[in-house]
Amino acid sequence: MKYNQYSYIGTSVSQAEKELKELGFQISSQKTNKANLATFVSQVYFHNPDKDDVFKSIIADSQTDLATFLHSDRELTEEIFYTIALQLLEFTPYIDFDEAKTFIKHSHFPIIFQPKHFLLNFYQLLGTRTKNGMTLIDKLVSQGFLPADNHYRYFNGKSLATFDTNALIREIVYVEAPLDTDKDGQLDLIKVNIIRPQTKAKLPVVMTASPYHQGTNDKGADKKLHQMEGELTVKKAATITVTDSHFQALQVPSSNLPISPAQESFSYIDSYTLNDYFLARGFANIYVSGVGTKDSDGFMTSGDYAQIESFKAVIDWLNGRTTAYTSHKRDKRVMADWTNGLVATTGKSYLGTMSTGLATTGIKELKVIIAESAISSWYDYYRENGLVCSPGGYPGEDIDVLTELTYSRNLAAGDYLRNNAQYQKMLAEQVKQIDRTSGDYNQFWQDRNYLPHAHKIKAHVVYTHGLQDWNVKPNQVYYIFNALPEEIQKHIFLHQGQHVYMHNWQSIDFRESMNALLSEELLGLQNHFQLPTIIWQDNSQVQTWKKLNNFGSHQTRQFSLGQEKKIIDNHYPSSDFKLYSDDYHAFKHDLFLKKANEIAIDLPIQEDMLVNGQIKLNLTLKSSSNKGLLSAQVLDYGQKKRFSDLPTILEHNSIDNGQNFSREALRELPFKKAPYRIITKGVLNLQNRTDLLTIEDIFPNKWMTITFNLQASLYQLQKGDSLRIVLYTTDFEQTVRDNSNYILVVDLAKSTIEIPIA
């Protein structure tokens, strides 16, 4: 294990002593270090009244247990302190470590022994993670060290799990949104699931905007998957024009209906464990699925500002600007008198996407977004550079398929009877607007692009994204992060996994960092927490995270791709075409081994380089036809240790998110030998070779010069590594599977790869 600690907030000795005493630790700067150590260890093991037994179970060094040491006149040394400290943090001598100081060095242990300020070491220990994924103070509180009395308690600038999760209020209200997306003449009502502790304190809110949470129509969506086999469309030369999107909300009339408590309750909802963590620390949880979902009104508009407005309306209700009702009858109002109105949003993928969209409305009470694997432009999710491009792992999906999946109103049979005909009519119109024929950008996609609205963001922004996420690709976060206003606070965690959460990883204290941030922004705690702008996981070594100031570099290194002209044949024999169409994994396997129709260039790396940003291909090429599709991937090629894409379980149920509440597994990305690693990739319609809004003719056998930006990356290359640049046409996982008979010729002597380096 290596420590990468970002959540700890440095403090003075006097403040540390004050906070320790407030927690009940009976230590004092007037006592000796050994006396304080005995007291501290006794209280850490508060469940066991036999302290002599506790002391005998811990060693001070390889020859002495703690009981013997405490009764001796030996001095408390650095080695003894570290040996004891590691045991308090759940590391086992002779199994996890032999010599404490060696382990401390290799694990980047964040505590320096300070015999003159020893109380500070106890304070730091409580704020440091154990081997099993919780800080020591969180572990103690989870075991009952502090009562769950529904009052806020803080340590090191973070809220502690002192809220009773065994007696939670679970209620449902229906918020009136300024929308009529199903065109039935009534404002849409939005179902809101609320989970909150029973307390007199005014609670902030952690909200997850999830179109999935009221259920999904998986069978219906599967039936709508598109066939990917077909011919690449030859488009007419043109310039595409779009207009700025300006969503216009409807008027919501004021109401003087009777006020009532919420009347509808629920017993269970599929919660997000990061939300559970905050729930136990005095943050109400809200789950809302928005328009077009089960028990709400409206049509599933899939990514536009009408959908976002349905989530914004919930924040408006929390702050008294719109009405919530007890039911669809709209006869009694419910007031959000239990909240301070301040909101943070959480969630991954579609959920994180809605966080970004919400932030671009500039709503002032949205103080923090924690957006993980989030989309910033829906065009770039379902299209790329003038091509229909399925999300990685989901061939044949498009936004109409997502609409069918998330329009969960049809899961309620009565709603289906009353509203399915109107839904089918509106879905058919959406299908026309998405334009699968050309793959071009249009007004539909402009209305689902949050980048032009990034300047309106006022919230404190936290993004996480996997650099191996080929579902929501890295450009999504690269573009939005670099479009954020200079004056706001922003951070990004870039990990080496794919489309995954990272709050329960061993190597980084993400969960605790978010606690410090939300305690400051939503609870008003003046903790002076500072988080680096960019925190990224170094791909070249295990459990190592580093800091950067920028995602993307203007400094580049350029390399020639060769000296000859090479051919990419688009056409495959029918047996190969069928094999690859039936199993895109077989295609990827052959592609990386130079067995597909491709040009593969191996480029030796002569010095260490940190790739930071978008690798660019400058190519001179021609097509034998009046069309052409170009795909590219850049690999770190050759057998060596690399991260796997998915985290694996290190310890089951070792993380307690409260006091015996919402336990989850500790995870980490495995680091093991592999033959290659994808650094970046991209696809391009050669008719869109200049830019997205310009469609140009391709003249057969006429040379073209193109610049092709691939997906953004942060990747450490080392001297002796080898880059493999793969150029090909059809990508059987993501693009149209066109088996027509044409070739691309690339003049490698006039082609280069341009690598941005930090």
Swiss-Prot record:
GO biological process terms held by the UniProt record: proteolysis
Superkingdom of origin organism: Bacteria
EC number assigned by the record: 3.4.14.11
Catalytic residues of the enzyme: 349 (charge relay system), 469 (charge relay system), 499 (charge relay system)
Keywords attached to this entry: Aminopeptidase, Cytoplasm, Hydrolase, Protease, Serine protease
Any Pfam family: Peptidase_S15
Record GO terms (molecular function): aminopeptidase activity; dipeptidyl-peptidase activity; serine-type peptidase activity
Reactions accelerated catalytically: Hydrolyzes Xaa-Pro-|- bonds to release unblocked, N-terminal dipeptides from substrates including Ala-Pro-|-p-nitroanilide and (sequentially) Tyr-Pro-|-Phe-Pro-|-Gly-Pro-|-Ile
InterPro entries tied to this protein: AB_hydrolase_fold, Galactose-bd-like_sf, Pept_S15_Xpro, PepX_N_dom, PepX_N_dom_sf, Xaa-Pro-like_dom, Xaa-Pro_dipept_C, Xaa-Pro_dipeptidyl-ppase/CocE
Entry GO CC: cytoplasm
Record SMART domains: PepX_C, PepX_N
Localization per record: Cytoplasm
NCBIfam families with a match to the protein in the record: PRK05371.1-4
HAMAP family associated with the record: Aminopeptidase_S15 (MF_00698)
Function text: Removes N-terminal dipeptides sequentially from polypeptides having unsubstituted N-termini provided that the penultimate residue is proline.
Family: Belongs to the peptidase S15 family.
Subunit (UniProt): Homodimer.
Protein name per Swiss-Prot or TrEMBL: Xaa-Pro dipeptidyl-peptidase
Source species of the chain: Streptococcus mutans serotype c (strain ATCC 700610 / UA159)
Species lineage: Bacteria, Bacillati, Bacillota, Bacilli, Lactobacillales
Gene name, Swiss-Prot/TrEMBL: pepX
